[in-house]
UniProtKB/Swiss-Prot annotation:
Reaction equations catalysed: a 1,2-diacyl-sn-glycero-3-phosphoethanolamine + S-adenosyl-L-methionine = a 1,2-diacyl-sn-glycero-3-phospho-N-methylethanolamine + S-adenosyl-L-homocysteine + H(+)
Record-given protein name: Phosphatidylethanolamine N-methyltransferase
Cytoplasmic side: 102-104, 212-218, 294-295, 410, 486-487, 589-976
Biased composition (Low complexity): 787-807
The enzyme's E.C. designation: 2.1.1.17
Region (Disordered): 1-36, 326-366, 780-810
Annotated GO biological process: methylation; phosphatidylcholine biosynthetic process
Assigned protein family: Belongs to the class VI-like SAM-binding methyltransferase superfamily. CHO2 family.
Membrane protein topology class: Multi-pass membrane protein
GO annotation, cellular component aspect: endoplasmic reticulum membrane
Start-end of Basic and acidic residues biased regions: 1-27, 343-353
Organism: Trichophyton verrucosum (strain HKI 0517)
Matches recorded under PROSITE patterns: SAM_CHO2
Amino acid sequence: MARLSGVERPDDSGLRERKARAVEEPVKQPVESADGAAAAAQAKKKTIGRTPDGTAFTVPHTRDMVSQLLSPSEPKNLSDILVLSIIGLHIVLLYLLPSFLRIPIFAVLFLSWRAAYNIGIGWLLHMQSNHSTMVLWARQTKIFVNPATGDNPHPQLYSFIKRELETKIPEDYSFEDAPIEYNTWLVFRRVVDLILMCDFTSYCLFAIACGSRPAEENFLVLILRWVVGLGLVLFNLWVKLDAHRVVKDFAWYWGDFFYLVDQELTFDGVFEMAPHPMYSVGYAGYYGISLMAASYKVLFISILAHAAQFAFLVLVENPHIEKTYNAPPPRKRTIESHAGLAGEEKSSRRPSDSSEMVPPPSPVALPSSTHNLVGVKNLDLHRITDSSIILIQVLFFALTMLTPSTPIYQFFFVLNAAIWRLWYSVGIGYILNCQSHRREWTRHFVKFGETKEEAWNQWKGTYHLSMTLCYASFIAAAWKMYTLPENWGYGLAILKHVLGAGLIALQIWTSVSIYDSLGEFGWFFGDFFFDEAPKLTYSGIYRFLNNPERVLGLAGVWGAALITSSRAMIFLALLSHTLGIAFIQLVERPHMQKLYGRGLRQDAGLVRSIKRSLPPSFKQLHGSVDRILDESIEFIEEVLDTARPKLAAGVTTFVKDTSELFHKYPARITITRIEPDLAGYDMNDYSINVDTSDCITIRDGAEDKSEVLVFEYGSPIKVNWTAPLNHSKRDWVGLYMIGQNPSREVTNVSSWGRWVATNHGSFDSVLSEKGLIASDVVVSKPGTSNTSKKPSVKSGSGKKSSTSTSSHEVASGQMVFSGDKLWWTQGVFEFRYHHNGKHNVMATSRPFEIRIPKFDDGQIPSHVSSNGNGFMTTAIEQALLPIVQNCFDRDPEISPQTAEEPFGCETEGDLKYAKRVVYAVHQMFGIEFATEVVRADGNVQNLAWRICNAKKVLAPYSMRKSNGASTPTGESEEMK
């Protein structure tokens, strides 16, 4: 049975998996009669949409793309005629082109439309999700503003769009009254219609151009090929229709990138069968068409298009879903007692999902997940498990490459793979079975005075090493048994390699999905070692399958057997699959039934969908087969219980992960845009000054002649600027490290998102206005002014050809740099004022320093280190709290107000707050922690306790000075 973990909740695993339920908020209408009551009841079924600013509106009913374009009963407008005309041109082109040009031309056409889909639409949606770019374009161009107001510079375009949209939506829609977000989405829909229809049309025409019948094909194979191909196409059609039935046009056209609807997330139909059905099984028709065309060209271009669609899903849709629907839960304002926390831990199967962990000195119910084992990113050569695996992999590789592929060596490699598979399934299964019944693994370590956490860590190492050796030996055997085809065009050589690679990719994806759903705890069968009142969840791949590893999790071994076409590899694949199923039935299933009882789900989503479509006679047959299997399994278990040998296995628990230096040296290759003519701008009117109200001013130099502005790490920095009244509305201010830009007149290094616009609505990104406080406030500037107009910039001032002592008016503004717009590292920085969206520097600020104060051990009484840690811990808490608050952007929703208050939650993929804290702790105390440690500690009090103990362990090395040049990230991460 599946190792399940966590608390059950909906799995929002696909953008187009959101079904709109009738909203309970009625549209207010007077009800004066029976007709009025019926109208009110109908109003309750209306879908209510909400824009990002909270505006509520009734979402009109719209028709799907195919019905709009092809149904004669649907009204047609100019955009429909345009789409149909372009489709018709594609068809005409197929018949006009000579035969030798059809395939390359339509291959280019299809790839162009596919790029417009995945890259073009993907970029638009990415920008809309993060910056509301399309809505900002609509606001800037004012295309939805009524021309009667005199503010619309495009009245003809307004009339055209209004006519186009109102023709398509006759009910519940008013172009003038609809929110700008909804109108923008409707225009975006028309662009999507054009791209999707041309994408599919060009693909079908390419398949027609490539279609042929192999010369050696007999009639039976021809019939079979077309029957299977048509079946896949019809299945694809059903998937698309059922998906549209569930999600409607709102999710089909990515509506929640523009607005949200008042609805619940529900899953039924095709969304119970497979994850992301629109992008997984929803592309089965591509392979059906490839089969009917009997063309490898169509197959390969189908695989390429399918891979591009998955990239679109991963890079565009999934991040938006996480941000929109899987926001972290609200933070608890007061920390709970240890007992309450322990109880909460007992009810959670995924300790890594909670940041409110028990303080380090207290015992925990479930193991800490601060130092995971699975994955390349968790590779730690200081651990003997990881170093042993690397050495063994090198040994396997050397033996495989250096030995000949003679029959005797092939035999030994296959035998080695079979032995490791037996150990991985039978040996590991025996250990887990003993652990389930008698806790033998844990008892062994307790006997020698170890804890069950130590037993758990040793078990993880044993299982991880066994799994790695099992698959390494299998790959080595496959390599020995494989021979390159002499003629790739003969027989099914290419097809076997393609299908085999697909099966291997399927197993890799399944394993990654299982790990994402279970976490480290479930992956290593944690409920065999910690069984305190667990709860089940069926998220991720487990929403569709109870035991994905039973079939999909072993697809790769059959892929290797298919590629090698070797009887020995078929034997290994059969052995692996048989032992894998036996492991599930004889080890996992009994333990899960004992632990969870009736809490186990009988049928997964895919099984439920299939059962609903079966006639009653088949359902009865299925029940009889299940009973026979259950009785057979019980008999086998009784036989095994009567004779079970005892095995003893133990593994002892060796160069630190390489630190990422990407952000230490930012990219210096950028495209610098220069404004060629700056005539008409008085350079003396440009200035930029740092607000010194929050800075720490210290004397610089022995003679104390100058002052250095010093800001605390992470504290917001206010900037005041002035510019001529005629300055460009697209001016902007960027934050840079001193020394990055050799020129004072031109900036040639990217700001990495650390910039703020001087005016609202000037750039296609809402983030550009984040931090903007005031702009274009007219003030009087006393003193001299430059009348020459000739630009010359040096440190914020220009050359003067003539002067005047009279004051004059200038524009001024204020902005604040905070959060992701700071550098989050120590160093000396400056602000630069740029002109008209380009990189001409009009003014620079005074340099200032970002500094993290070192914790002074000298302020701790000498007796503390020997008699106790209480005073030192308190001192560390007091020094650390304000820095941690800065690291959390001083946001009251996530930033702790006291040392005991827990940190706010952040998503698994975004650990920026924890990385900031890690960097600050490293610079303050000379101690480097992993981000997982910060998340596990959960508050300043626990973190201070850990720092205090680390200082004792590492003394006198804990205060080694760092150069402070690196950014506070353990992984490459671009600051937005």
